[in-house]
Regions:
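P-loop/Walker-type NTP enzyme "switch/lid" segment
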Residues: 1-63, 151-159
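Inter-motif core of Ras-like GTPase G domains
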Residues: 39-40, 56-87
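Structural motif
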Residues: 43-47, 80-82, 113
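Conserved Switch II/interswitch segment of TRAFAC-class P-loop GTPases
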Residues: 50-53, 76-94, 119-121
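Conserved C-terminal guanine-recognition region of P-loop GTPase G domains, centered on the G4
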Residues: 65, 70-72, 90, 94-110, ...
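Short glycine-/polar-rich loops that comprise or flank the Walker A/P-loop
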Residues: 74-79, 105-110, 136-138
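Beta-strand-loop-alpha "switch" segments that mediate conformational coupling across diverse proteins
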Residues: 116-162
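NTP-binding/hydrolysis catalytic cores, primarily Walker-type P-loop NTPases
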Residues: 155-207
Length: 207
């Protein structure tokens, strides 16, 4: 999270061990938008996990809005769709792209990320799928394998590999570029909640 007048970033975390189960966080995307407004943060990175195709199809079946559409409906949001850089991973990402397109959800306002699961060059099927997705999504990137993240998360960003840091910078720039194409550059300042008037009660007897 980053404030409009802050030079650095702030991290809101529970401080638990990397292998601990995640906290039960609110599923409604609007809750994260309200949190950003209350904190006065200009940019917020919310790390969530749900199966996009299953969510979209389930919401169509039961007539609900669904988490995926909720994220896309938020002002100035750029969803980052992640999948493993494997044959199964790109197939899942392709199914996601087709599902979003069928539901009229703007895939071009998304960034697709293929995460390498091992060192070395990505398989040919992965590279071919990434080429096809480039014409559909706002941007397609590949994040190299970094065993430090797998073992320790982001507790010490200074220990990330140089390739990993470059990939993170490229991802951040891709998100900003997609946002700029959708809403203009520069983006408007983050919304702030209206201040409540201070009411001081004086006198009177309590029942």
């Amino acid at each position: 999270m980053r404030g409009a007048e802050q030079a650095g970033w702030q991290v809101l975390t529970d401080g638990r061990e990397w292998h601990a189960s995640p906290l039960p966080l609110p599923a409604d995307p609007a809750a994260w938008y309200q949190l950003a407004a209350v904190g006065g943060w200009q940019a917020v990175l919310a790390d969530t996990a749900h199966s996009v195709p299953n969510d979209v199809l389930s919401s169509r079946y039961d007539g609900s809005r669904g988490q995926t559409r909720g994220w896309y409906d938020l002002p100035y949001s750029v969803p980052v769709l992640c999948a493993a850089a494997t044959a199964d991973g790109v197939q899942a990402l392709q199914r996601t792209a087709m599902t979003l397109h069928a539901e009229g959800i703007p895939l071009q306002r998304s960034v697709a990320v293929l995460v390498a699961t091992a060192d070395g060059r990505s398989p040919g099927a992965v590279r071919a799928a990434a080429t096809v997705l480039t014409s559909q999504a706002g941007a397609v990137l590949t994040v190299p394998h970094d065993p430090h993240i797998r073992a320790h998360g982001l507790r010490n960003p200074a220990k990330l590999s140089q390739r990993g840091q470059q990939a993170a910078a490229s991802l951040a720039q891709a998100v900003l570029t997609v946002a700029g194409k959708a809403w203009g550059d520069p983006l408007p300042p983050a919304r702030r909640p209206a201040a409540f008037p201070l009411v001081i009660s004086q006198g009177g007897n309590r029942p």
